[in-house]
Each structure stands twice: as structure tokens, then as C-alpha cells.
Curated annotation (Swiss-Prot):
S-S pairs: none
The family this protein is said to belong to: Belongs to the TACO1 family.
Name of the featured protein: Probable transcriptional regulatory protein Moth_1704
Superkingdom of source: Bacteria
Organism of this sequence: Moorella thermoacetica (strain ATCC 39073 / JCM 9320)
Location of this chain's protein in the cell: Cytoplasm
Database matches in Gene3D superfamilies: 1.10.10.200, 3.30.70.980
Keyword Cell membrane listed: no
Amino acid sequence: MSGHSKWANIKNRKAKVDEKRGRLFTKIGREIIIAARMGGGDPEGNMRLKAAIAKAKAANMPNENIQRAIMRGTGELEGAAYEEMTYEGYGPGGVAMLLNIATDNRNRTASEIRYIFSRGGGNLGESGCVAWMFNPKGVITVEVPAGDKREEVILQAIEAGAEDVDDEDDEVLEIKTAPGDLEAVREALEASGVTITHAEVEMVPQTTVTIDDPETAGKVMRLIERLEDHDDVQAVYTNADIPAAIMDQLDI
């Protein structure tokens, strides 16, 4: 087991904010559409779709919305043809940023994302400029208070194939897996009765850049927020590590 996940603090801080913005269902809907288009509409035979549906249900997305998104993906209903892309760039303090994009107009999206980067003190980079700094990993977060049950859950995760368990938080475990092992580990944890709050493949930085200046940290967070506010941005990953003490000083 390694040390604390450097991106976890930022993700946890922003989770409640994202829920309030009203864009969550739109983003998850696009995720379902793309997954169904690529692998078919049966979640039992399409692990990416299964994970997207689980994410939708965790966000309390109505079942009819989920089904419509699946049907748009399979072509049973008409809808926009979304294209997946990856954008790379740099934020304030030179931190690396990697964006998952789902767009029906790549020229519009590129122009708008470039403007957001520029306005936020960063710049949109060339393909390959920062992607090498990240690795795909299954990331699962579960609510497990300290105690005997916690140790049991850690052992279950490792036995099911987890590569790493971050247990520094007193209430939450963050578990990392190889992308192909995510579903098996998630199912093993569900069988143990714990509450899973997040489970999907993410781009995890190999190393991090500590931002211990509040002004720079604030600029990084504001840029992340503006990027996540864009409808075409499905996810934002960064190698920024903003310590909890600095995060507490930010008015974000």
C-alpha cells in the first residue's frame, strides 16, 4: 500500500459542487451513449456500459434517461454522434492536465477549451505533451470507518486483485486496480456489503507536483472548475497535489 492519493482531496472537495451544477446527467448520458455505441446495449456483455449505468444510478439518474441514452447509442433513437477525444495541456504552476472529451463538433470544442485554458493561466498543448505522465487505473472509493471491518475490506480488495489501497482517510478507502480488474474488485466489495461511492477507470498521475502556494492553488482549482463546467468535458485529471491545509484556505 502506498501513500495518500494526491488527486483524492481535490476530487472529494469537488464532488458536491459537481452535483449542484445540473450538468451531471448530461455528461453521464454521453458516457452511456458512447459505451452502448461501441459495445452494444447489453450491460452484461459490455463492461464499460455496465460501469456507466452504475454511475448513473449512483447519481440518481432516472431509469428512463438511462434507457434513452442506451437506445441513442445503439441507434434505436436518433441523437447526436458524439466523438471521444483527449485534450492535453498545462495549468498554473506548470501542472499537467488531461481532459476526456465527448463532442459532436470538434472544432467548436477545441476553440472553447483553448480559450478556457488561456483565460485560466494555462495553455492547451499538443497531443502527447502530458499523456505520458498518466496511467489508466481502476479507482474505487468505499465508505469504511476505522475498525476490524476496515482491515477485512482491505484484505478482500487485495485478494480480488487490487493493486493499491490508500487507507489514510479515517472514513474512506481508495482502491486502485488494473483497468481490467475493476469490475471483479467492485463486485467483491459489493458482496462484502460496503458502500461504494465511486468506481471507474481514471487517468492517474505517475508523480505529482505539490502546489503549496494558495494563490497558485486557487488558480488551478478555478481552471479545473471552468473546464468541468464545459458540457463537452467528461473528466479532468491533473498531477497537481494541493495539500489539505492549502485547500482549506481556498474560497472555491
